[in-house]
Amino acid sequence: MEDSYKDRTSLMKGAKDIAKEVKKQTVKKVNQAVDRAQDEYTQRSYSRFQDEEDDDDYYPPGETYSGEVNDDEGSSEATEGHDEEDEIYEGEYQGIPSTNQGKDSIVSVGQPKGDEYKDRRELESERRADEEELAQQYELIIQECGHGRFQWALFFVLGMALMADGVEVFVVGFVLPSAETDLCIPNSGSGWLGSIVYLGMMVGAFFWGGLADKVGRKQSLLICMSVNGFFAFLSSFVQGYGFFLVCRLLSGFGIGGAIPTVFSYFAEVLAREKRGEHLSWLCMFWMIGGIYASAMAWAIIPHYGWSFSMGSAYQFHSWRVFVIVCALPCVSSVVALTFMPESPRFLLEVGKHDEAWMILKLIHDTNMRARGQPEKVFTVNKIKTPKQIDELIEIESDTGTWYRRCFVRIRTELYGIWLTFMRCFNYPVRENTIKLTIVWFTLSFGYYGLSVWFPDVIKHLQSDEYALLTRNVQKDKYANFSINFTMENQIHTGMEYENGRFLGVKFKSVTFKDSVFKSCTFDDVTSVNTYFKNCTFIDTLFDNTDFEPYKFIDSEFQNCSFLHNKTGCQITFDDDYSAYWIYFVNFLGTLAVLPGNIVSALLMDRIGRLTMLGGSMVLSGISCFFLWFGTSESMMIGMLCLYNGLTISAWNSLDVVTVELYPTDRRATGFGFLNALCKAAAVLGNLIFGSLVSITKAIPILLASTVLVCGGLVGLRLPDTRTQVLM
């Protein structure tokens, strides 16, 4: 009887062991199937295995299968239940320690529903929570990495890119006078050259900023700077005006991505207490770019001897050398940028934990070695990564031909950029975007509007002063003479010239009124702003002159001959003094920004971004009223320097605030949109203020003051980001 009872007990125990093992293996197989499906959906290869414990420990500690009998006998788990599939991962790379992204989101027996069963609102809510946790953790990690050699190296690399943007703004204004004559640009088309660059920069800022949030800061910056450098070099060699316009358009399109990408990139490797100051120091490179362009223009463009020609079809003048020299900062930044890593904050945002961890370790080790502490260990093991939400569909390889796949890829990327841009108007950044839009537009409109108004007013004052020095010659007669010198700023009225020779004469701002030329010869004559009004020419020979029909107004010709008229466009001697003056004024105006840059960098983290932004814009608006007293060139130049020095603090603080208000997933996109709006406001300001130069001072002064003060008051309503971590 006792033996029979023992047999039944052993049989029950064996049956329970078998049932337990069957259930365990069933649950294991279900979880493995879900794991594979999850891996295929999320494209993870190993992260789910990082904190996965042994399969035999499926039941939590202290929890046993109901009805289980405790025994000391060897279980079948010691020799059975070994799954050969587990051997696939033995000895393989298990990844750098990261957050629990393994089975937390996997649907399994008795666990919460997985991501595929959640609606988008729930997923976005979880992602926001993850981003808040990541922001706090990332700030601590950056503080542990310290501020040192890595940040300074990146500072100079990104500074070269920002310098290239500053150069691009000045290049067209400096080469325009020379390019107009060299490329035969008509007066009606000269304005296109200045506007086309801003148009390219406007489109480029939006596109490259959006792309930086998709493919990364480094990748986007490399591409956009390469585009700028290539077409900037190409523009120095093209001959036709149309090709030159296209090259400058594409060059502007490339450089448009520099500002939004550079500031987003650099801000993401700076700790909170360093961010405001060092972003302000970075702004100084834009000023250096302006100084570099002014100095190079001053040194190169007036040297007409620095030119060569290959027949009459190809002309390479000094202004083309200047264009090449101005492309050097861009090329330097591209070369240096290839040695820098991607932004670790961006990599964490897109779920690339391991790459971000290695870059953060690189930053830490680089700074520690520079401090003489190479033994210090990077203690971070796990970094939170936000939940990834699929938005776009991956293109399959069988999508038609290669060009169709390329077209679909471009369209998909553009659609993704547009979706990111629309999210800039979603909660919680919608109100900030609207306020930033107002501040960016008003500051750009007032700054660039007055920037073009100042030189035009100075030029207008120069013209008035030049007119006062005009020499008037009236009712005189010259016979049997020969002239071979330059005639400048003269008006000849009622004159009579007989049997005279004008040999190699350069006429500059000379007007002949009611005059008679008898048996005269004009040989190898060049003229600028020279006209013959109501004049009579008798038996006169014109040989190798540039006298176009429009220079003869109501004039009469009797038995006259025109031989070998000069064709094409030559670099003229016009405005040699004015060219130097333009370079000098721009040089001083750009140099005046230096004190404002230093002050803003030192006080950015002390008095706050908003105080500096609002105060600088209000003071700039008030300073406009001093223009009432600008009655001379020197006074206007002084006002220009004062105005530039005050507004630079507003620009620096606005850049810092914009970077800090947007979260990482839309930071470059939002910055790019606002920078594109800045360029549109600049074009509008140039048109409006440029049309008011010769009318009155009152309208430009009141308009600029009102716009700047209103923008400054709106800027004071923005959130203070001085104590916030970078989201």
Swiss-Prot record:
Tissue expression notes: Expressed in specific subsets of conventional synapses in the retina (at protein level). Expressed in diaphragm motor nerve terminals (at protein level). Expressed in a subset of hippocampus neurons (at protein level).
Highest taxon listed in the record's lineage: Eukaryota
One Pfam family linked to the record: MFS_1
Cytoplasmic-side segments: 1-154, 213-226, 270-280, 342-437, 600-609, 658-670, 717-727
Molecular function via GO: transmembrane transporter activity
A GO cellular component annotation in the UniProt record: dopaminergic synapse
Membrane topology: Multi-pass membrane protein
Basic and acidic residues bias (residue ranges): 113-128
Annotated region (Disordered), positions in chain: 22-128
Region: Interaction with SYT1, residue numbers: 1-57
Glycan attachment residues as annotated in the record: N480, N484, N534, N559, N565
Modified residue annotations for Phosphotyrosine: Y466
Keyword ATP-binding: no
Post-translational modification Phosphothreonine, affected residues: T79
Effect of gene knockout: Small interfering RNA knockdown of the protein in Neuro-2a cells (which only express this SV2 protein) prevents uptake of C.botulinum neurotoxin type A (BoNT/A, botA); uptake is restored by expression of rat SV2A or SV2B.
Family: Belongs to the major facilitator superfamily.
Self-association state and partner proteins as the record states: Interacts with SYT1 in a calcium-dependent manner. (Microbial infection) Interacts with C.botulinum neurotoxin type A (BoNT/A, botA).
Function: Plays a role in the control of regulated secretion in neural and endocrine cells, enhancing selectively low-frequency neurotransmission. Positively regulates vesicle fusion by maintaining the readily releasable pool of secretory vesicles.
PANTHER family linked to this entry: SYNAPTIC VESICLE GLYCOPROTEIN 2, SYNAPTIC VESICLE GLYCOPROTEIN 2C
Protein name (database record): Synaptic vesicle glycoprotein 2C
Source organism (scientific name): Mus musculus (Mouse)
The encoding gene: Sv2c
